[in-house]
């Protein structure tokens, strides 16, 4: 409903849908569906996506359990799923902190791996189309924050032309 707000409580691994007008919680996520998440996006009227850092304190010292994920929740079916997880696993996407995902209207997926200074762009079929590393002249990688794809027709033409030129 217009005016409702998604709130993401990272350290609780919890997302809620809050209605300020009535001061009520409309929905809250189930436990253990994601861990230390970021970036809730409305994908369709009945679906949201959540960037799952999948961060846990594991006995072997690892912090990210496998790879980061994009978790989808469907309000109509009350089901959770992942989006292009095999692609994220293949590219070893694993930022401990922060991170963003953006599912574009054509189904493509943009991922900001914030802590590793990497931005990835996947086709809707999971093919890695391009990667950007935020590398400075000293060859160090620097964090990325709040990257996004501007999805407008004129931008799509520019991106497609760029991708075609890179393929040659």
Where in this protein do the model-derived segments appear?
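Histidine-/acidic-rich catalytic cores in large beta-rich domains
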Residues: 1-168
């Amino acid at each position: 409903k217009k005016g409702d707000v998604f709130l993401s409580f990272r350290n609780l691994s919890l997302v809620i849908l809050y209605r300020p007008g009535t001061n009520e919680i409309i929905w809250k996520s189930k436990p253990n569906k994601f861990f230390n998440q970021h970036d809730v996006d409305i994908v369709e009227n009945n679906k949201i996506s959540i960037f799952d850092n999948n961060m846990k304190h594991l006995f072997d010292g690892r912090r990210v359990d496998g790879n980061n994920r994009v978790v989808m929740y469907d309000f109509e079916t009350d089901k959770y799923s992942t989006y292009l997880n095999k692609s994220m696993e293949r590219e070893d996407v694993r930022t401990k902190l922060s991170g963003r995902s953006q599912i574009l209207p054509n189904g493509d997926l943009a991922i900001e791996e914030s802590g590793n200074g990497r931005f990835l762009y996947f086709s809707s079929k999971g093919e890695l189309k391009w990667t950007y590393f935020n590398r400075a002249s000293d060859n160090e990688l620097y964090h990325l924050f709040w990257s996004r794809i501007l999805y407008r027709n004129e931008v799509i033409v520019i991106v497609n032309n760029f991708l075609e030129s890179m393929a040659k």
